[in-house]
Amino acid sequence: MKTVLLLICLLGSAFTTPTDPLNYQFGAHGQKTAEKHKYTHSEMPEEENTGFVNKGDVLSGHRTIKAEVPVLDTQKDEPWASRRQGQGDGEHQTKNSLRSINFLTLHSNPGLASDNQESNSGSSREQHSSEHHQPRRHRKHGNMAGQWALRGESPVDALGLVRERNTWKYNKNTVGLDENNNGSEEEEAGEEEDEEWGEETDYRDMKHRARGTSHGREYRRWQNENSRPSGEFLRDSSLPVRITKRHGEKFSMEEESQEKLYKEGKLPLSKKNHNEDQGEKRQSEESKEHFQVVNQRKHRAVTKRQDKEGSNAEEDDNDSGDDGEEDLGNVWREAVYEEEERMQSNDQDSITNKQKEEITAGDDSGVYREMQDYKGDKIKDVTHSEDNHYHHEPPNSSSKQQLQTSSSVESMNSTEHEDEVKTTGGSYHEESARNSTGKALPDLCRNFHCKRGKVCQADKQGKPSCICQDPAACPSTKDYKRVCGTDNKTYDGTCQLFGTKCQLEGTKMGRQLHLDYMGACKHIPHCTDYEVNQFPLRMRDWLKNILMQYYERDQDTSAFLTEKQRNKVKKIYLNEKRLVSGEHPVELLLHDFEKNYHMYLYPVHWQFYQLDQHPVDRSLTHSELAPLRASLVPMEHCITRFFQECDGDQDKLITLKEWCHCFAIKEEDINENLLF
């Protein structure tokens, strides 16, 4: 019986020896908990020996050996071979369950295969090591069991073994793994073994910390490679871990070999990190190069504007001057268009200043958008002002004629700037195509503006400059866009007219050539003294009728007159004594003016206010009068002489007082408060 009992104790101790590999738990910071590695005593509660796996976590690196309970009194008569067979079956079942768990782990996380292999090798090494230290314990257990058997005590009671069950739970993918941990021994035997293994436990704790740090680095690298959040890896068990010095040396050698691989860059993870670092460096270099290119563009744009200002100043100087031998009409026309060109030059300077400010504040694309918006606003203002000038009913004409003339004049003046933009853009695209084979010249003429009749072109050095527009290269126009020059020649459009003027620059003919009026050239009879005296009567009636038509249209759209203007015009419109528009004899017009004098006060002031825009100084230059004159010349051949005679002091400026005197407004009725 003693021999049988001794064999049972030896076999039970062999199968209850813990052979787990290193147990680690990586939390949020990849650190292990030291409490999980303490040796389990018989007094320790059952709750501390139970490990749980959280939802979505991956269990790896665990090996559990099913413990065998010592034979009870009822099992003493069983044959030893049957018990051995039962133990073998239990071990076989345990191995099969572990293989299924390892397969699930490797299938869910292929990247952890290396960790599992390392854990498997560690488990086998630890099992051999633990068997190496078992004979001494077995002899002690056998001696004590023999003494207690002589006293008649049960081996189970004598050894005080407690059956413990640990269960790991997989949430959603439940895998039940029952472990029978034989973790209770006598207090005396536990104390002796603690003293015996004290040195190894200290060494084990030290290696745990080193291995924890190494595995923490490997985990962080694996997490960066996958670039997605991964679950925490719990490598925890309630079973104690025993590492001998020989195992510690093997672990150290493995760590050194892994560190060498990472340092040499042989692992794919390190290669990927290296490529990512190179990509970030390239992106930073590209951003720096883009910033330098933007700064260079800004510097070139500022230089272009300075060069343009100098060229515009020279061109204005060349265009100035009058010929002393010219007659009074030609002198007036030349002064009108010199003033008009000077105004356009001032507008270009203001645009240039605005562009410089925008360049300082933002990039080139933002400057271009702001410049285009500004030009669009200028065109709208000029068009609206010209609408007020050209939508007038020509004296002694019907409403149908007035609408046709107004639409023709409006389209002609609204496309005047469009012709300039088109020709400039065409030259720019041709130049860009011309330089496509050589060095690229980006945005050289985009923000470089030339006055009418000239286009931008870059020279061999890449510097933009203004050259004369080729009249033959101007786009084709429709008949209503034709204009008549002061040389009594019809041009297809303003592009052709000012291109011809630019080619004749520096000559007497070039200085005299200007836009005379809209439409094809026709015979303009000479204005007699009688006709020029009747002209103010027709002009006053025309201004009054224009305001009435604007008021009628504003009742639906409110696009022509302001609220203050509508209130003023409403009183005239509702007056029953008002003379309706139409062709009336001169006598009737004079009678209505004397009878309803107050109805003509505001229309005369209103027309002066509409013309006095560049600048608003209570006086009209010939440039400010030119749009109105050019639109009315075909119908009123006396308008040029009328404006000349209104300038009593011949200073090329028509003040508000001179304007009102031309329309027979009394001096006491001249009121600047009506200029709205």
From Swiss-Prot:
The keyword Cell inner membrane does not apply. Residues 95-108 have a biased composition (Polar residues). Residues 1-16 form the signal peptide. Ca(2+) binds at residues 647, 649, 651, 658. SUPFAM superfamilies: EF-hand, EGF/Laminin, Kazal-type serine protease inhibitors. Coiled coil: none annotated. Keywords: Calcium, Disulfide bond, Extracellular matrix, Glycoprotein, Metal-binding, Secreted, Signal. It is found in: Secreted, Extracellular space, Extracellular matrix. Residues 397-408 have a biased composition (Low complexity). Its main location: secreted. Glycans are attached at residues 182, 318, 396, 413, 435, 488. Residues 184-202, 312-328 have a biased composition (Acidic residues). It comes from the Eukaryota. Residues 35-151, 173-369, 385-437 are annotated as: Disordered. Residues 35-44, 249-266, 273-291, 385-394, 415-433 have a biased composition (Basic and acidic residues). The keyword ATP-binding does not apply. Could play a role in the late stage of neuroretina morphogenesis. Belongs to the SPARC family. This is SPARC-like protein 1. It comes from Coturnix japonica (Japanese quail). The gene is SPARCL1.
